[in-house]
């Protein structure tokens, strides 16, 4: 079925524009209450990031849940993985995170978690889509059964402690110089708290949220400020979170960026070496570099691929017994501890390896030599360019150029009006030829030529 609300990662869009309106949040909360707690009397945990519209969306959720006899438990500003944690540890019927992740403040979104702290699968989202359409026409709780929201203090401390407890005792982090970029987002308190407790020599940037500066010039998709701070302070390593702190990008001491593929490769190798890796390998998406796959082969490990979205990675991990997975964009799932991507948790594992091994982050994070890979994002309005016959022909031609010497992934973003065109091959000239052949066709169909 065609979806009106849900995309790759929950519901997301420009605030006060469909689908990201207060009415959508109201419909969702009522539909979710009827679907997951039809008898009422349950609790739902709700967290949010720092963007200005978060209070508005939260208020709409509260109105819907209380009208159905469900008690909203307000966690305040917390990372997305903290909401997943509290959903599974409090017996809640549902967890809701109000966030648009790495997007600017003009956008917001809703991420949903089951009582097990797991993002909903496609079938569940489609059931909610159906229920949201008629949400305002059904019955509500009797007046005496309408609930009141309550706040829950201590979620941030509980989450930080859970992350820190994953580290081996007795490690000395006091010699590590670390710069942490919190993106003016949900991790602006939890990230510094965790690294301060470690005893690292810490410099914090991007930790002064004002409601509109989330992800603006800071964070995992804007690493210029972090690179400059690492070089200026002589830090050994820099870590950038995104707006809801469920992913990270790492910067080495030279100011060079290491993406999620390199981070996953490092963690996989370390977990394999210490006998903690399950499933004989790890899980990533179709966007991960083929160099990661080749590296894992040399270690006797496998790489399973899914479509884009950390929830699909998580689904495959649970179904096939893996405990490590993630995305090139920096969502890393360590399922022995967390059920979803977690930037702080992954960052702590990297710092632990660096503290144990010594040496330079630049050496440690160069786990494999990436195959030449390039991604072009093409914005569009109106019809989906991928429906064009000319685009379909051009994509087939580009894939024919690559043959078995490379890969091409072309997809519509589930969170923004973008077509993403990615190509990779060991032969860079071949990769670029195929990439631009495909991208030019998409650009023309999008009306950008």
From Swiss-Prot:
It is an enzyme of class 5 (isomerase). The keyword Phosphoprotein applies. The modification Phosphoserine is found at residue 101. Mg(2+) binds at residues 101, 242, 244, 246. The active site is at 101 (phosphoserine intermediate). Binds 1 Mg(2+) ion per subunit. One of its GO terms (molecular function) is magnesium ion binding. GO terms for biological process: carbohydrate metabolic process; peptidoglycan biosynthetic process; UDP-N-acetylglucosamine biosynthetic process. It catalyses: alpha-D-glucosamine 1-phosphate = D-glucosamine 6-phosphate. GO terms for cellular component: cytosol. Pfam families: PGM_PMM_I (PF02878), PGM_PMM_II (PF02879), PGM_PMM_III (PF02880), PGM_PMM_IV (PF00408). Its EC number is 5.4.2.10. Keywords: Isomerase, Magnesium, Metal-binding, Phosphoprotein. Activated by phosphorylation. Its cofactor is Mg(2+). It comes from the Bacteria. NCBIfam families: glmM (TIGR01455), PRK10887.1 (NF008139). Catalyzes the conversion of glucosamine-6-phosphate to glucosamine-1-phosphate. Belongs to the phosphohexose mutase family. This is Phosphoglucosamine mutase.
């Amino acid at each position: 079925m065609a979806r009106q609300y849900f995309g790759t990662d929950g519901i997301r869009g420009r605030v006060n524009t469909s689908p990201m309106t207060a009415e959508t949040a109201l419909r969702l909360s009522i539909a979710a209450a009827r679907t997951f707690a039809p008898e009422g009397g349950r609790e739902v945990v709700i967290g949010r990031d720092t963007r200005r519209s978060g209070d508005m969306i939260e208020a709409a959720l509260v109105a819907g849940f209380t009208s159905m006899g469900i008690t909203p438990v307000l966690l305040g500003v917390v990372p997305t993985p903290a909401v997943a944690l509290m959903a599974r540890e409090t017996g809640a019927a549902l967890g809701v995170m109000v966030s648009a992740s790495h997007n600017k403040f003009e956008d917001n979104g809703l991420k949903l978690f089951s009582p097990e702290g797991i993002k909903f699968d496609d079938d569940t989202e489609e059931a909610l889509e159906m229920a949201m359409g008629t949400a305002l026409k059904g019955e509500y709780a009797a007046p005496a059964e309408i609930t009141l929201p309550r706040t829950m203090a201590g979620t941030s401390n509980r989450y930080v402690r859970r992350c820190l407890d994953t580290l081996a005792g007795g490690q000395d982090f006091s010699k590590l110089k670390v710069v942490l970029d919190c993106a003016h987002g949900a991790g602006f308190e939890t990230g510094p708290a965790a690294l301060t407790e470690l005893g690292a020599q810490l410099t914090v940037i991007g930790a002064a949220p004002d409601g509109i500066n989330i992800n603006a010039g800071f964070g995992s998709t804007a690493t210029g400020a972090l690179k400059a701070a690492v070089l200026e302070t002589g830090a050994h390593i820099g870590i950038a979170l995104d707006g809801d702190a469920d992913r990270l990008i790492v910067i080495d001491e030279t100011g060079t960026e290491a993406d999620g593929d390199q981070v996953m490769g490092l963690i996989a190798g370390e977990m394999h070496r210490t006998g903690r890796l399950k499933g004989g390998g790890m899980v990533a998406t179709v966007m991960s570099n083929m160099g990661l796959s080749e590296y894992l082969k040399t270690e006797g490990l496998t790489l399973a691929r899914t479509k884009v979205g950390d929830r699909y990675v998580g689904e495959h991990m649970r179904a096939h017994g893996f405990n490590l997975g993630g995305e090139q964009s920096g969502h890393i799932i360590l399922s022995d501890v967390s059920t979803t991507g977690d930037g702080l948790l992954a960052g702590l594992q990297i710092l632990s390896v660096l503290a144990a091994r010594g040496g330079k982050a630049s050496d440690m994070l160069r786990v494999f030599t990436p195959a030449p890979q390039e991604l072009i994002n093409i914005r569009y309005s109106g019809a989906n360019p991928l429906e064009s016959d000319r685009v379909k022909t051009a994509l087939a031609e580009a894939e024919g150029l690559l043959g078995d010497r490379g890969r091409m992934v072309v997809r519509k973003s589930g969170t923004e009006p973008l077509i993403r065109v990615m190509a990779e091959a060991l032969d860079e000239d071949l990769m670029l030829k195929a990439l631009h052949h495909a991208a030019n066709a998409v650009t023309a169909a999008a009306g950008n030529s």
